[in-house]
Regions:
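Asp-based, Mg2+/Mn2+-dependent phosphohydrolase catalytic module
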Residues: 1-7, 19-20, 84-89, 110, ...
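N-terminal helical cap/lid subdomain that shapes the substrate entry/recognition surface
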Residues: 2-107
Length: 235
C-alpha cells in the first residue's frame, strides 16, 4: 500500500463506540414519546420499533440507503396506528438525532487524524449512518465527508468509494478505507477496488470470504502500518 494518497474512515464503531450511543438515543426517543404521545409507547416497545424498521426495509429495500427516512417512516406508521397525527414525527426525530450525536471519540482518533494530515494524506469519512461530522464538531479533521444518503447508495455498494476517489482525485489503488464492518466497509471497498484496512478494535474473528489488505487494532496500529512514526522521527 505504498501508493496510498487518500484515507477514508467509517464513523460508527470505527471512530467511536456507537452501540451505547444508539441505545441511549432510542431510549431518549422512547421516553419522550412516553411523556408526550403515550399511546405509542403503550403499544410499541423499543424492540417492537426495531422490528418495525426491519419490516419496513423488507417492504422497501431502498430505505437501507435512507436511514433518516427509515426512522421517520417508522414513527409515522406508529403514530397512525395508535391514532396520533403525523405531526409528531419531526419533533420526535429531533430528540433522537440530538442524542445520536452525543458521541465520545476514541482517545486515539483526533491525534491520529492530525498526524495523518501532517503526513500529507487526504482524509475523508464514509458512513451509512446519519451522524453529521459538522454537528459533531469534527468536520475540520476531514477534507470531505460522504454519507449513504448523500450519494444514494449504502456500503457495500461501491458508489461511496467511487465518489471518494473522484473527490480526492485518486485512483482506487491510491485510496485506503478504514472500517470495522466486514459486510459493508470491507466487502464494499474490495468490490470498488480500493485498499481496505480492518479496524478490529474488539478483536472479532475474521469473516470467511472477506480478506482485508491489512488489519489493525487501533489508530496507533494504523499509524505504525503507514510508517508515520518513522517518518516523523527522521524529520
Amino acid at each position: 500500500m505504498n501508493r496510498i494518497r487518500t484515507l477514508t474512515f467509517d464513523l460508527d464503531d470505527t471512530l467511536w463506540d456507537n452501540r451505547e450511543v444508539i441505545m441511549a438515543a432510542e431510549q431518549a426517543l422512547h421516553d419522550w414519546l412516553g411523556e408526550h404521545y403515550p399511546r405509542v409507547t403503550d403499544r410499541y416497545s423499543l424492540e417492537d420499533m426495531r422490528r418495525m424498521r426491519t419490516d419496513l426495509v423488507g417492504q422497501e429495500p431502498d430505505l437501507r440507503n435512507r436511514i433518516t427516512d427509515l426512522r421517520k417512516q417508522s414513527l409515522r406508521l406508529a403514530a397512525r396506528t395508535v391514532g396520533y397525527d403525523e405531526e409528531l414525527v419531526d419533533p420526535a426525530f429531533a430528540i433522537f438525532i440530538a442524542a445520536r450525536h452525543r458521541v465520545s471519540l476514541y482517545d486515539d482518533v483526533t491525534p491520529a487524524l492530525h498526524r495523518l494530515r501532517k503526513a500529507g494524506y487526504r482524509l475523508g469519512s464514509l458512513t451509512n449512518g446519519n451522524a453529521d461530522v459538522y454537528r459533531l464538531g469534527i468536520a475540520h479533521l476531514f477534507d470531505f465527508s460522504l454519507t449513504a444518503e448523500s450519494v444514494g447508495r449504502a456500503k457495500p455498494h461501491p458508489r461511496l468509494f467511487e465518489e471518494a476517489c473522484r473527490l480526492s482525485g485518486v485512483s482506487p489503488a491510491e485510496l485506503a478505507h478504514v472500517g470495522d464492518e466486514a459486510d459493508t466497509d470491507l466487502a464494499g471497498g474490495l468490490a470498488a477496488g480500493v485498499n481496505v484496512i480492518w479496524m478490529n478494535r474488539l478483536e472479532q474473528p475474521a469473516t470467511p470470504g472477506i480478506t482485508p489488505h491489512a488489519e489493525v487494532r487501533d489508530m496507533a496500529g494504523l499509524l505504525a502500518m503507514l510508517g508515520i512514526e518513522a517518518q516523523q522521527s527522521r524529520n
